[in-house]
Amino acid sequence: MPELPEVETVKRGLKNRLKDFYIHDVEVITPRSISSEGGSKAFVKNIIGLKSGEWTRRGKYLICSLHSSDREEIAGWWVVHLRMTGQFQWFQKKTKSCKHTRVRIWNKDGAEIRFVDTRNFGQMWWISPTFLPTEKITGLKKLGPEPFSKEFNPFYLQESLKKRKRSIKSSLLDQSIVAGAGNIYADESLFQAGILPTKESKKLNKTEIKKICTSLTHILKISIGEGGTSFKDFRDLEGVNGKYGGQAWVYGRENKPCRKCGVKILKAKVAGRGTHWCPNCQK
């Protein structure tokens, strides 16, 4: 699943390509991709004729304000979650639909933003301007603070973890604790912090918690700079792979030597997810 760096990369691409993008026509090929009230028919009816405004990211959600003509007031919201394999593709000219295309959106000049999703778990919503997206999408409402926000700090994390018996890996995957982190960057940040992913959350001391906060934000910043990670399906709008995977410390490196100490990287299921760590560097 695309995590914070990948979704941030997509957001930046959408912000660049869809600046003042007037929605002239929409084709929903797979109705189940639309999760908002009224389904695909209401989605198409409500967004045609509107202009895309500011794109933002909240956790793994993409949020776009929509506007009528040149008016500044918001005429609705377009929200997207890529889930496992969702991706946007940009086409400057009219192009035939490709396999796994779910939604196609054009401007009057024929430029297209296309939503392609192999597993078909991705979701889109149209939200009326009378509501905020958080009022209609439960997942958005439950999100914890962003890793780069002031709210995400060692004191906050210590308070959030002090009664949790679950592993620290499980806690970092919990979107109500920190928004946007996922399997890849939980493994990577725990390696950099020198902490075993199986360690019980409430047993972490202040120094360890501070290391986790620092490591997570550091790893996320590096990955954003590399355009994210492309181990499987992720591409940006132009079809370019993310480059972080080539420098990953542990993720995807089972049985390979640790980049720090040379000991073989281990992999096992933790919190139901394939988890990588160095048995020597992490305690």
Curated annotation (Swiss-Prot):
<feature type="active site" description="Proton donor; for delta-elimination activity">
    <location>
        <position position="273"/>
    </location>
</feature>
<dbReference type="GO" id="GO:0140078">
    <property type="term" value="F:class I DNA-(apurinic or apyrimidinic site) endonuclease activity"/>
</dbReference>
<dbReference type="GO" id="GO:0008270">
    <property type="term" value="F:zinc ion binding"/>
</dbReference>
<dbReference type="Pfam" id="PF06831">
    <property type="entry name" value="H2TH"/>
</dbReference>
<dbReference type="Pfam" id="PF06827">
    <property type="entry name" value="zf-FPG_IleRS"/>
</dbReference>
<dbReference type="InterPro" id="IPR015886">
    <property type="entry name" value="DNA_glyclase/AP_lyase_DNA-bd"/>
</dbReference>
<dbReference type="Pfam" id="PF01149">
    <property type="entry name" value="Fapy_DNA_glyco"/>
</dbReference>
<dbReference type="InterPro" id="IPR020629">
    <property type="entry name" value="Formamido-pyr_DNA_Glyclase"/>
</dbReference>
<feature type="active site" description="Proton donor; for beta-elimination activity">
    <location>
        <position position="60"/>
    </location>
</feature>
<feature type="binding site">
    <location>
        <position position="100"/>
    </location>
    <ligand>
        <name>DNA</name>
    </ligand>
</feature>
<keyword id="KW-0511">Multifunctional enzyme</keyword>
<dbReference type="InterPro" id="IPR000214">
    <property type="entry name" value="Znf_DNA_glyclase/AP_lyase"/>
</dbReference>
<feature type="active site" description="Schiff-base intermediate with DNA">
    <location>
        <position position="2"/>
    </location>
</feature>
<protein>
    <recommendedName>
        <fullName>Formamidopyrimidine-DNA glycosylase</fullName>
        <ecNumber>3.2.2.23</ecNumber>
        <ecNumber>4.2.99.18</ecNumber>
    </recommendedName>
</protein>
<dbReference type="GO" id="GO:0034039">
    <property type="term" value="F:8-oxo-7,8-dihydroguanine DNA N-glycosylase activity"/>
</dbReference>
<keyword id="KW-0479">Metal-binding</keyword>
<comment type="subunit">
    <text>Monomer.</text>
</comment>
<feature type="active site" description="Proton donor">
    <location>
        <position position="3"/>
    </location>
</feature>
<keyword id="KW-0238">DNA-binding</keyword>
<feature type="binding site">
    <location>
        <position position="119"/>
    </location>
    <ligand>
        <name>DNA</name>
    </ligand>
</feature>
<keyword id="KW-0326">Glycosidase</keyword>
<dbReference type="GO" id="GO:0003684">
    <property type="term" value="F:damaged DNA binding"/>
</dbReference>
<dbReference type="GO" id="GO:0006284">
    <property type="term" value="P:base-excision repair"/>
</dbReference>
<dbReference type="InterPro" id="IPR035937">
    <property type="entry name" value="MutM-like_N-ter"/>
</dbReference>
<dbReference type="InterPro" id="IPR012319">
    <property type="entry name" value="FPG_cat"/>
</dbReference>
<dbReference type="InterPro" id="IPR010663">
    <property type="entry name" value="Znf_FPG/IleRS"/>
</dbReference>
<comment type="similarity">
    <text>Belongs to the FPG family.</text>
</comment>
<feature type="binding site">
    <location>
        <position position="164"/>
    </location>
    <ligand>
        <name>DNA</name>
    </ligand>
</feature>
<feature type="zinc finger region" description="FPG-type">
    <location>
        <begin position="249"/>
        <end position="283"/>
    </location>
</feature>
<keyword id="KW-0227">DNA damage</keyword>
<keyword id="KW-0863">Zinc-finger</keyword>
<keyword id="KW-0378">Hydrolase</keyword>
<keyword id="KW-0456">Lyase</keyword>
<dbReference type="InterPro" id="IPR010979">
    <property type="entry name" value="Ribosomal_uS13-like_H2TH"/>
</dbReference>
<keyword id="KW-0862">Zinc</keyword>
<keyword id="KW-0234">DNA repair</keyword>
<dbReference type="InterPro" id="IPR015887">
    <property type="entry name" value="DNA_glyclase_Znf_dom_DNA_BS"/>
</dbReference>
<comment type="function">
    <text>Involved in base excision repair of DNA damaged by oxidation or by mutagenic agents. Acts as a DNA glycosylase that recognizes and removes damaged bases. Has a preference for oxidized purines, such as 7,8-dihydro-8-oxoguanine (8-oxoG). Has AP (apurinic/apyrimidinic) lyase activity and introduces nicks in the DNA strand. Cleaves the DNA backbone by beta-delta elimination to generate a single-strand break at the site of the removed base with both 3'- and 5'-phosphates.</text>
</comment>
